[in-house]
């Protein structure tokens, strides 16, 4: 296969940069200058047939000569207004790469609330000993009843972790195999009886607002809401009201409607709320592993083999 022209605008560190330069064909790579949105970068992008990174959606209209774009993310809602992938273009994402770190962060946030770590860290700042006050309030994950919305890579990994802790888990998905909950009625009943409601859903036309005011208010007073999916899935105003009025037991939020949150946002001051600030998928070798994923797919592309993790714009995953 002829040498491909490759445009790279993904966020890289030095090890990832070196790996790309040592692996890809010499003379085939153009690294974007930052900021990415510039006439120079657009001109380079328009001459490439492979892109690694998330370019503005407007760059795909009119359709470029691009044949394959490897996103540096799982989510791709910013491309869904395209309605369809330009003819001849395949888009892949990083499905599965963030499953373990995102699930670990969710568990860490839950344990912080259940084991009183949030209160103890706050007390440490003022040198206050709270052992006798905190200890009787500590809870275990063991035997907790959990509902997971979404049965993709993050949802499945989170389920595995919950089951390892001895939780009783049910998953909600309309089509994915292995999920026990399929209907809206089944989901409503499960949310109303759960100790933990964990959302791992992408943003699609079907999921936006799925966790609405009625469902949030139906949660038990001790229940904790977890979101590692997308902020748009949740009625955030209703969630904040329930947290402020102590109608639910707390929240662990990796994602929010607005990112970054402005300093005056009410979530900052909600009690028993852990804000992970969209760090859930992060880990030390994240950028290197993103690059390895791209290079593995590049090898398939060069051989004419099917690529991993081809997205469906219409479905949103």
Residues covered by each model-derived region:
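An N-terminal-biased, well-structured beta-alpha scaffold segment characteristic
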Residues: 1-92, 192, 212
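Short beta->alpha connector loops at strand-helix junctions that form conserved
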Residues: 72, 90-97, 173, 278
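Phosphate-binding beta-alpha-beta segment of Rossmann-like dinucleotide-binding domains, i.e.
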Residues: 87-145
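Glycine-rich adenosine-cofactor-binding loop
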Residues: 95, 139-163
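Adenosine-phosphate binding glycine-rich loop
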Residues: 109, 261, 270-292
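NAD(P)-binding Rossmann-fold cofactor-contacting core
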Residues: 164-180
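Rossmann-like adenosine-cofactor binding region
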Residues: 175-266
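NAD(P)-dependent dehydrogenase/reductase Rossmann-like domain
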Residues: 287-317
């Amino acid at each position: 296969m002829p040498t491909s022209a490759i445009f790279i605008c993904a966020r890289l560190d030095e090890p990832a940069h070196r790996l790309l330069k040592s692996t890809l064909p010499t003379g085939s790579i153009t690294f974007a200058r930052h900021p990415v949105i510039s006439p120079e970068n657009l001109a380079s992008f328009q001459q490439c047939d492979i892109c690694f990174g998330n370019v503005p959606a407007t760059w795909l209209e009119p359709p470029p000569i691009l044949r394959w774009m490897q996103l540096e993310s799982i989510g791709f809602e910013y491309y869904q207004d395209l309605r369809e992938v330009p003819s001849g273009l395949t888009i892949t994402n990083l499905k599965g790469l963030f499953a373990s770190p995102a699930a670990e962060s969710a568990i860490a946030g839950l344990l912080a609330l259940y084991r009183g770590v949030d209160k103890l860290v706050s007390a440490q700042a003022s040198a206050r000993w709270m052992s006798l006050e905190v200890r009787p309030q500590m809870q275990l994950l063991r035997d907790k009843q959990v509902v997971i919305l979404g049965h993709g890579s993050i949802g499945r990994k989170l389920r595995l972790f919950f089951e390892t802790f001895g939780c009783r888990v049910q998953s909600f998905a309309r089509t994915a195999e292995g999920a026990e909950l399929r209907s809206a009625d089944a989901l409503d009943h499960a949310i109303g009886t759960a100790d933990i409601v964990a959302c791992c859903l992408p943003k699609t036309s079907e999921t936006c607002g799925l966790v609405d005011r009625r469902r949030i208010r139906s949660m038990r007073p001790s229940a904790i809401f977890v979101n590692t999916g997308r902020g748009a899935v949740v009625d955030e105003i209703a969630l904040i009201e329930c947290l402020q009025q102590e109608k639910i037991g707390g929240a662990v939020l990796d994602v929010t409607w607005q990112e970054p949150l402005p300093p005056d946002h009410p979530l900052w001051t909600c009690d028993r709320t852990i804000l992970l600030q969209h760090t859930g998928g992060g880990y030390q070798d994240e950028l290197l592993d993103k690059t390895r994923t791209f290079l593995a797919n590049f090898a398939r592309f060069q051989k004419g083999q099917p690529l991993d993790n081809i997205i469906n714009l219409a479905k949103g995953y």
